[in-house]
Amino acid sequence: MDGILSGKTIVVMGVANQRSIAWGCTEALIAQGAQVILTYQNDRLKQSLQRFVAPDVPLIACDVADDDNVERAFASIKQQYGAIDGIIHAIAYADKATLEGDFVNTTKAGYDLAQNISAYSLIAVARAARPMLKPGASLVTLTYFGSERAVPNYNMMGVAKAALEANVRYLARDLGPQQVRVNAISAGAVKTLAVTGIHEHQQLLKLSRSMTVDGEPVKTREIGNVAAFLLSDLSTGMTGDVVYVDKGVHLS
């Protein structure tokens, strides 16, 4: 039986390992019939992906810290695979020093780095991909509750995620006329490589779990299932939205 993404080609950006939310999304997309293309930042991450990604899944180099690199990556995708139906943007980074202590001590360099990689990169990706997005295409990015609440030890990343959510709304407006949608998933805390880089991350995970409605943490595959929906033709009426997939943590 065909899935809701059968016949669609989706680019997934940000898979680091098998615990990544981006990988949970990738598995959900494949289960729903999508052809996926994964991007990687550098050779080390490429080698990591090759350990668990099926050999028939294309891997394309893309370092979002450099606009020209992003343009080359999507030009390569277009040349090899043609137009695409969607993108998952699951990329974020902040210097560890900007996540701890008092936010007032954030440096300009730390601020700029987090905003560039975590928020601006979505704009760069949308711009590079725009000529190859089919009508009905969908872009999905990942955010977190720390964008609207002052979460301990999240600091600069919370500010970057707030900017990312604003980017979603403006990109949704700009890309709407060509029938391209842009949405964000606000995912619950999951023990990923990114989360383990947060000071006292175990406390964050414990607190998040205590706030879910059923006492169980959200799973990466559950997040991926919602991403699949947002990338499918079942969600054509949704754009510019932040969709919570956190088992009710945001209710508290």
How should these model regions be labeled?
Residues D2-I37:
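Canonical Rossmann dinucleotide-binding motif of NAD(H)/NADP(H)-dependent dehydrogenases/reductases
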Residues T212-I223, L234:
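A conserved structural motif in NAD(P)-dependent oxidoreductases
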